[in-house]
Amino acid sequence: MAESSGNPPAERIGYITRVQSFSACHRLHSLRLSDEENKEVYGKCNNPYGHGHNYKVEVTVRGKIDPVTGMVMNLTDLKKCIEEVIMIPLDHKNLDKDVPYFADVVSTTENLAVYIWDNMAKALPASLPYEIRIHETDKNIVVYRGE
């Protein structure tokens, strides 16, 4: 193990991930496609009555580890941000009817990740957002990094 010289190390970058679960329903349906095309593209997820998910979202921030606090950011602040950006607008909601963003955007998990990213980016210092990872099911996971 390397010995410490007592000098602070060069800037270190850390990653913090907070996990949050929420439930919501939606229907995969594009206004740019005919009813027949929607059924073909989205299958059972185009059911007119919609369907629901218990989403698990991982929000990861990246930044310099503050030499004084030892933190990239205060987890309490990240928790509040997630509450405002994810839980209040999305939990137990119909994404297509209750979230204005999805009025003309198909509520795929990819677009949900973009929505969460864009709103987290507005709520956090610019350098911090790193990744949004959404587990739609145990087998289906979407990752978005603002690219």
UniProtKB/Swiss-Prot annotation:
Signal peptide range: none
Family matches, as Pfam families: PTPS
Record's keyword terms, sorted: Lyase, Metal-binding, Tetrahydrobiopterin biosynthesis, Zinc
UniProt xrefs under InterPro entries: 6-PTP_synth/QueD, 6-PTP_synth/QueD_sf, PTPS_Cys_AS, PTPS_His_AS
Co-factor remark: Binds 1 zinc ion per subunit.
Obligatory cofactor(s): Zn(2+)
GO cellular component: mitochondrion
SUPFAM superfamilies: Tetrahydrobiopterin biosynthesis enzymes-like
EC number: 4.2.3.12
One of the record's GO molecular function terms: metal ion binding
Gene Ontology biological-process annotations: tetrahydrobiopterin biosynthetic process
Catalytic activity: 7,8-dihydroneopterin 3'-triphosphate = 6-pyruvoyl-5,6,7,8-tetrahydropterin + triphosphate + H(+)
Residues bound to Zn(2+): 26, 51, 53
Enzyme class: lyase
Subunit organization: Homohexamer formed of two homotrimers in a head to head fashion.
Note: The active site is at the interface between 2 subunits. The proton acceptor Cys is on one subunit, and the charge relay system is on the other subunit.
Entry similarity comment: Belongs to the PTPS family.
Name of the protein in question: 6-pyruvoyl tetrahydrobiopterin synthase
Organism: Poecilia reticulata
